[in-house]
Amino acid sequence: MSLNIRPFLAGNWKMNGTRESLGELRAIATGVSSNSGHLFEALICVPATLLSRAYDTLNGESLLLGGQNCHFDDYGPYTGDISAFMLKEAGASHVIIGHSERRTVYQENDAIVCAKVQAAWHAGLVALVCIGETLEERDNNKVMDVLAQQLEGSLPDDTTAENTIIAYEPVWAIGTGNTATSEDIAKVHYFIRDKICSRFGDEGNKIRLLYGGSVKPSSAFELLSIPHVNGALIGGASLKAIDFLTICDVCRKL
């Protein structure tokens, strides 16, 4: 953690959740509000089909809501896609962009990610930009090269701490139960911090850097204690209020 940066916990429900799941969301919101939520910020990115209903359910609670992806255009003939403006209208304040599953399954490259970031800003959303290496890239000692390329290509020149959050998610750790070592995470987050400070000046010191990759209640304290880790991008552990709020409690106590 960094003392001068307010921690941020982001939950990504992925393609999970129905109307019945809104009870868990409400429990998370209540827990965040009563769990010294002013000490940190919490976000849940629900499926687009739940976003509007989730917004109405929370009715002004301190829990933030986000989308999991957006198109790079504001509108148009893109069957099945959702624009950033649509997410904003439905109640989102943030949107995940460039998640490893989008980069690998849908072959979204840095240029597409960058265009989506700009679309998110245009709609008034904060972009949560994901970067990370594959197992093959890790085994070939290309981690820093890959991250440098993704940072350069995915972030527009007018990136600020107000419009962007960065999440480092080693692809090989997502949903596998594996996590990088604390030493490796510290090195990577220091590298990211150095890169964004070199490019964006002092603004780079203010941008929140999250770690994502099998973040669980049992690993939260160790991960959130690492220097330059300003929060977490949480997958499966965000689906249940008891798990997500346990991580929130760890964050509160640090």
Swiss-Prot record:
GO terms for cellular component: cytosol. NCBIfam families: tim (TIGR00419). Its EC number is 5.3.1.1. Its main location: cytoplasm. GO terms for molecular function: triose-phosphate isomerase activity. Pathway: Carbohydrate biosynthesis; gluconeogenesis; Carbohydrate degradation; glycolysis; D-glyceraldehyde 3-phosphate from glycerone phosphate: step 1/1. This is Triosephosphate isomerase. Involved in the gluconeogenesis. Catalyzes stereospecifically the conversion of dihydroxyacetone phosphate (DHAP) to D-glyceraldehyde-3-phosphate (G3P). Pfam families: TIM. It comes from the Bacteria. Belongs to the triosephosphate isomerase family. InterPro entries: Aldolase_TIM, TIM_sf, TrioseP_Isoase_bac/euk, Triosephosphate_isomerase, Triosephosphate_isomerase_AS. The keyword Nuclease does not apply. The active site is at H99, E169. It catalyses: D-glyceraldehyde 3-phosphate = dihydroxyacetone phosphate. The gene is tpiA. It is found in: Cytoplasm. Homodimer. One of its GO terms (biological process) is glycolytic process. Substrate binds at N12, W13, K14, G175, S214, G235, G236. Keywords: Cytoplasm, Gluconeogenesis, Glycolysis, Isomerase.
